[in-house]
Swiss-Prot record:
One Pfam family hit: Anticodon_1
EC number: 6.1.1.5
Entry function: Catalyzes the attachment of isoleucine to tRNA(Ile). As IleRS can inadvertently accommodate and process structurally similar amino acids such as valine, to avoid such errors it has two additional distinct tRNA(Ile)-dependent editing activities. One activity is designated as 'pretransfer' editing and involves the hydrolysis of activated Val-AMP. The other activity is designated 'posttransfer' editing and involves deacylation of mischarged Val-tRNA(Ile).
Record text on cofactor binding: Binds 1 zinc ion per subunit.
Record-stated family: Belongs to the class-I aminoacyl-tRNA synthetase family. IleS type 1 subfamily.
Record organism: Helicobacter pylori (strain G27)
Taxonomy, superkingdom: Bacteria
Gene: ileS
Gene3D superfamilies on file: 1.10.730.20, HUPs, Ile-tRNA synthetase CP2 domain-like
Protein name: Isoleucine--tRNA ligase
Taxonomic lineage of the native organism: Bacteria, Pseudomonadati, Campylobacterota, Epsilonproteobacteria, Campylobacterales
Residues at which ATP binds: K613
Placement of sequence motif 'HIGH' region: 58-68
InterPro entries: aa-tRNA-synth_I_CS, aa-tRNA-synth_Ia, Anticodon_Ile_BEm, Ile-tRNA-ligase, Ile-tRNA-ligase_type1, Ile-tRNA_ligase, M/V/L/I-tRNA-synth_anticd-bd, Rossmann-like_a/b/a_fold
Catalytic activity field: tRNA(Ile) + L-isoleucine + ATP = L-isoleucyl-tRNA(Ile) + AMP + diphosphate
Top EC class for this record: ligase
Amino acid sequence: MKEYKDTLNLNTTTFSMKGNLSVNEPKTYAKWQEQQAFKRMQNRKDNHGDFTLHDGPPYANGHLHLGHALNKILKDIVIKREYFKGNKIYYTPGWDCHGLPIEQQILERLEKEKTSLENPTLFREKCRDHAKKFLEIQKNEFLQLGVLGDFEDPYKTMDFKFEASIYRALVEVAKKGLLKERHKPIYWSYACESALAEAEVEYKMKKSPSIFVAFGLKKESLEKLKVKKASLVIWTTTPWTLYANVAIALKKDALYALTQKGYLVAKVLHEKLAALGVVDSEIAHEFNANDLEYLKATNPLNQRDSLITLGEHVGLEDGTGAVHTAPGHGEEDYYLGLKYNLEVLMSVDEKGCYNEGIIHKKLLDESYLGEHVFKAQKRIIEQLGDSLLLEQEIEHSYPHCWRTHKPVIYRATTQWFILMDEPFIQNDGSQKTLREVALNAIEKVEFVPSSGKNRLKTMIENRPDWCLSRQRKWGVPLAFFIDKRTNKPCFESEVLEHVANLFEKKGCDVWWESSVKDLLPPSYQEDSKHYEKVMHILDVWFDSGSTFKAVLEDYYGEKGQSPSDVILEGSDQHRGWFQSSLLIGCVLNNQAPFKKVITHGFIVDEKGEKMSKSKGNVVSLDNLLKKHGSDVVRLWVAFNDYQNDLRVSQTFFIQTEQHYKKFRNTLKFLLANFSDMDLKDLERSHNFSPLDHFILETLETTSTGVNSAFEEHDFVKGLNILMAFVTNELSGIYLDACKDSLYCDSKNNKKRQAIQMVLLAVASQLCYFLAPILTHTIEEVLEHSQVLCAFLQAKDVFDLKGINILEKLRLKEFKKPENFEAVLALRSAFNEELDRLKKEGVIKNSLECAIEVKEKALRENLVEELLMVSFVGVAKEKISETPAFTLFKAPFYKCPRCWRFKSELENTPCKRCEEVLKER
């Protein structure tokens, strides 16, 4: 029998089924860098508008992990999406270069080398070199993810001009009266020997002693109450702070019960405390808290007086309703102390050990000197003697240092703060506090997800003053001079601008290298002996929080618009970068420095647990890239609901790889089947069939849905819409139905050419929607299709832009076939019956069938195409009957070329195929 395979249009494409991504992507990315692809993107002439994404800086320390990849890939998708829409994009990647983690790395290295480095300038030089090294490492690792940006000129917070910009932002804060030096309790990391800001604290579970202690009322207080004995019972989980107790706070207007044995507790808590055995069960007297105010009790640890006060912070849900108050070790205690003029006792050093203050003020005996507060707690509890009513151990959420992961303490020290509740002058001449301005600014910002707005609002509503000062070396200094004659900082513009100019020319190292005289402007040098330098450095959150100023407003000039259109970071940045940027923006410009905040979740393992080396559940980014390639990693990011935590395992990446293969194989099929088109056919009108109109209308609906989802940055929704179209309507219906025409019709057949135009339109939309995500793959698609490039008028992926399918195909509208849903329903029922007949061995495939349809209104040619049968009508040999249709054996012979049963003679081509063969 004659072979007809060579007469079919079995077109091929050089676009490979296998991407071999891990080998090919690095070559593509190197080419993009060499050709300065990002600059080309910025210089495209058909820009419709501007779009700025301001990069929250990663820390220049260590290699990238999957969390970095998630963040940078999402940003890259957002940026490229805006670019392909036709906007001019601004994106300058940056790095946070100062701070404690780098200091710790250098200190550990020096310790291993058994050397010390007292010279701060040399120490800072080592820190700078470390940051430079990892900045380059991370930059190259980012580029392997297929991300684009101004990586040739990124921002670095350690650049001299950048340091000057950070300092100038600080100066603005000072000039507006919001920067003050205060002696108050703040989070203190004894492991880092430095103050911490709210954003540098993480909460973890910790076991602590839980003790109930009786403070006996003094004789005069007992006489006022007309009782013989009474002891206020306090509850605390920080016994080490009892040495600094100066007061006990009660709940205003609440009733307090005095038991028969003389213990005073809140009445509503008495029953619970009696059940615990803290107090006896019989109540002898009741007192209103207001009548107890200003009475005095005795601290059983050191016999010092403890004033009874009323506090708004006192709750009646737990404890005793009587709160141990040590203004040197608690913020609420401190503010209560201001109200009652309480003494601030704080005798704990930088390392968290008791210092000589405990001896001078007779707070503890000298045996505690130099002992760490947490280690001392056992002895303190023993020393309480009979005053200890109950001791337990509890596990509770406790603040820890985010860098060392060690517990922190509250410790009153002299630090510099940005004040949240100090009114300052607004642009309209009114006065508002920073808290008020920030809360108002939040209302004008869009949040994705929307829950982020309330989260940030709540944090701003409840946050304390911002502790800015750090007792470290690697950072931007709080470069102010204290006038020793007044003990006040010098905020004169001439002095501050002179320092800023020095930083811009020489960097911040000059603050350590130069004398006071050399740092002052000439007009102040004569009085230099009256000034001394502040030697604290700035909280690194101030560095990163002021990046919008340096990148978008001053130093980097044409790097984007301020406020930026979007910032995009992990959800933990509500308490970090989002807050610091918001607060600095509100001080400098009375507005948020961003219009939209997008947040993503964290990377967790397949069980939803946090990844850690100790658990052995870390998935290596480098291994993923080597095994799957960056486009698969990018697709995994986009195909997940990034607003929640992303679960990751090899299983998830294998699933993503299947999605990738579906897109790739579909594109390969499309490319192959329009590869033989004459480019002249792109410029003329075509007569599209009802089936063509169906898929084009579905493509239009799909495009609208994907566009809408992508506009909301809901990439997983958009991709699911796209994948459903590719799987169901395109592959499941249209391509199957068109294969006969594509393979068997003449190359010049008008129907076939119309189908090819449809395939071009589909490929165009797939490229447009997938380009922000699978940029390398779409670049590869265009490299392998001259026809598609001509249709899109694009030589590579960076020429892509949205197209109007109707205009491109010279159509006024898409005309969906009448009764099409009925044909699809018929197709579904037919396929079900076909499966049964195949299993029973009656037939092998649908082409062996003829079908008589009961619903006569259905178009025969559409039924034949969609059901892929050889004949519509009645035939002799019935094989099945259903309420909707009757199936027969096809009444003709199988065509050896197209395999449809349409030949009048055995082993002879059908009429259609004969005509095609004559043309060859």
